[in-house]
């Protein structure tokens, strides 16, 4: 393969060659002529777009809503249909006996940790003059909201795997609705965690999925998937709908806790694009448009721009994981632990059933290499790998990390003697398209210090084309507009990768 070193000033011309608009053809060979046919199509999830179009064009009264199955309601919610506002649903209300969150939480049985947390949540502080008070109970009672957050985190972790309905009953669905609606405007952590937990709950059997689609959650989710206050709200609401539809047999894959579906085309995807962020990044932050001004067009450019500029149906997924510079506890995961976790989740999401393209920033490139080493079948399906400022041979930040407190496993991976790069080199010939993007502007470090986070000699992989981008480390993956040099590289890379994927069909 010929290898090119291309300066960023030459890249803007690439943009116009790949720009096109993709409009899926939603027409049917049969045609829908009556509201009964539209309802039947929605219930069978056949020609759903045409059925929705028929209903919107003919504007029948809402009496047909009672004929829609939970599956049809889920499809409507997933598409953000306004029809969900008119569906009769079960109210998410608490029983008269459940006057507080603590009484509701007491119904769930999640083991000793849960019982201990419940006791702490409901404890009452002793007055100082009460000599019979147990030692350590003179302190003010802990914040109810803080304890509720901790208990909800525990529930989220416990529901990442299948659970016994006897331990977490169906009442968890209205409970999470109440948590979300009560704290949406006052505590983002609690409201987002309620949504994340519901996305796990949706996978635990038809009763939970049906409860979601026939309760107050239905109109709320249909609104959130389109008009959520944040990208996180929109992505998690989409995940809830997809997971519930998987449980009901409509969708043949699952979106586990670390996987987000950024874009899903109307047609069968030709490829899966997997985005992996880097150190201190996140799926809701790393892939946003560069926000140097107040005129922000996109909070997730892969989701908003790529479907407009790539004329092929593609599914776009994002992996999300915590990554830090410094370690204050012993609970952070190593690269191998994360890779093992992601292997299971990618398989559940159906990644590997079709050609795969990876787009990775910084540490995300190392994680992708670990995944491909551990999953030979996934490596065979990989047609493209874009390294964006990935430290293949270490970074000065690792040495800096040793000098402050306790560097994390993530920082230690940036050492030059890390053997991962050498191991991956042995299998990289199997990947037809490999591209490297290199940062060329210094980043702010500490105080007035500046420096290149990932120097050129480390960011350039041994194979494939190389592009130098005039940006700092954390912005090299954030194009400011669709004519940006960095975005042109992405389009060029995707075009080449999709061409390779199409060759495999012949």
Where are the model-predicted features located?
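Flexible, membrane-associating and regulatory peripheral segments of lipid-active enzymes
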Residues: 2-305, 311-354
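Hydrophobic/aromatic beta-strand patches that form the interior of the parallel beta-sheet core
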Residues: 274, 317-319, 384-386, 433-438, ...
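Serine-dependent carboxylesterase/thioesterase catalytic core
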Residues: 277, 326, 336-429
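Short aromatic-enriched loop/helix-cap "lid" or pocket-rim segments at secondary-structure transitions
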Residues: 285-289, 329-331, 382, 394-401, ...
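Active-site loop/turn elements of alpha/beta-hydrolase fold enzymes
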Residues: 321-323, 390, 439
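Catalytic histidine-centered segment of alpha/beta-hydrolase-like enzymes
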Residues: 328, 473-480
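Active-site-adjacent alpha-helix of alpha/beta-hydrolase-fold enzymes
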Residues: 407, 425, 440-472
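Post-His helix in hydrolase/transferase enzymes
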Residues: 478-494
């Amino acid at each position: 393969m010929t290898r090119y070193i291309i300066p960023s000033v030459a890249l803007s011309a690439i943009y116009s060659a790949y720009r096109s608009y993709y409009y899926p053809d939603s027409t049917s060979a049969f045609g829908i002529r009556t509201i009964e046919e539209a309802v039947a199509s929605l219930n069978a999830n056949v020609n759903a777009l045409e059925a929705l179009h028929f209903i919107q064009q003919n504007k029948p009264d809402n009496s047909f809503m009672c004929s829609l199955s939970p599956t049809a309601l889920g499809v409507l919610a997933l598409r953000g249909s306004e029809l969900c506002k008119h569906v009769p649903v079960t109210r998410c209300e608490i029983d008269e006996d459940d006057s507080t969150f603590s009484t509701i939480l007491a119904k769930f049985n999640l083991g000793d940790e849960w019982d201990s947390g419940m006791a702490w949540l409901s404890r009452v502080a002793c007055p100082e003059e009460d000599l019979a008070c147990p030692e350590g109970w003179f302190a003010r009672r802990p914040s109810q909201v803080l304890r509720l957050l901790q208990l909800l985190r525990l529930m989220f972790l416990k529901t990442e795997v299948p659970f016994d309905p006897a331990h977490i009953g169906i009442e968890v669905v209205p409970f999470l609705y109440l948590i979300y609606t009560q704290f949406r405007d006052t505590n983002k952590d609690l409201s987002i965690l309620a949504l994340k937990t519901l996305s796990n709950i949706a996978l635990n059997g038809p009763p939970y999925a049906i409860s979601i689609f026939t309760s107050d959650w239905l109109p709320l989710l249909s609104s959130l998937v389109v008009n959520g206050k944040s990208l996180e709200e929109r992505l998690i609401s989409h995940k809830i709908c997809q997971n519930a539809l998987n449980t009901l047999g409509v969708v043949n894959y699952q979106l586990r806790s670390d996987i987000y579906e950024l874009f899903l085309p109307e047609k069968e995807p030709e490829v899966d694009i997997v985005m992996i962020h880097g150190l201190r990044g996140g799926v809701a932050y790393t892939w946003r448009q560069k926000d140097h001004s107040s005129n922000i067009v996109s909070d997730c450019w892969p989701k908003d721009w790529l479907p407009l500029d790539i004329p092929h149906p593609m599914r776009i997924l994002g992996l999300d994981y915590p990554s830090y510079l410094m370690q204050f506890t012993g609970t952070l995961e190593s690269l191998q632990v994360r890779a093992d976790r992601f292997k299971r989740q990618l398989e559940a999401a159906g990644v590997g059933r079709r050609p795969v393209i990876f787009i990775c920033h910084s540490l995300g490139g190392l994680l992708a290499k670990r995944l491909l080493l551990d999953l030979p079948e996934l490596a065979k399906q990989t047609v493209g790998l874009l390294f964006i400022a990935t430290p293949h041979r270490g970074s000065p930040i690792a040495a800096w990390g040793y000098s402050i407190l306790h560097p994390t496993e993530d920082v230690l991976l940036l050492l030059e003697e890390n053997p991962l790069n050498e191991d991956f080199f042995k299998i990289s010939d199997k990947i037809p398209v490999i591209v490297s993007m290199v940062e060329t502007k210094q980043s702010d470090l500490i105080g007035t210090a500046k420096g290149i986070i990932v120097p050129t000699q480390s960011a350039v992989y041994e194979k494939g084309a190389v592009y130098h981008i005039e940006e700092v480390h954390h912005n090299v993956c954030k194009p400011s507009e669709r004519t940006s040099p960095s975005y042109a590289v992405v389009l060029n890379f995707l075009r080449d990768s999709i061409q390779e994927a199409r060759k495999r069909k012949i």
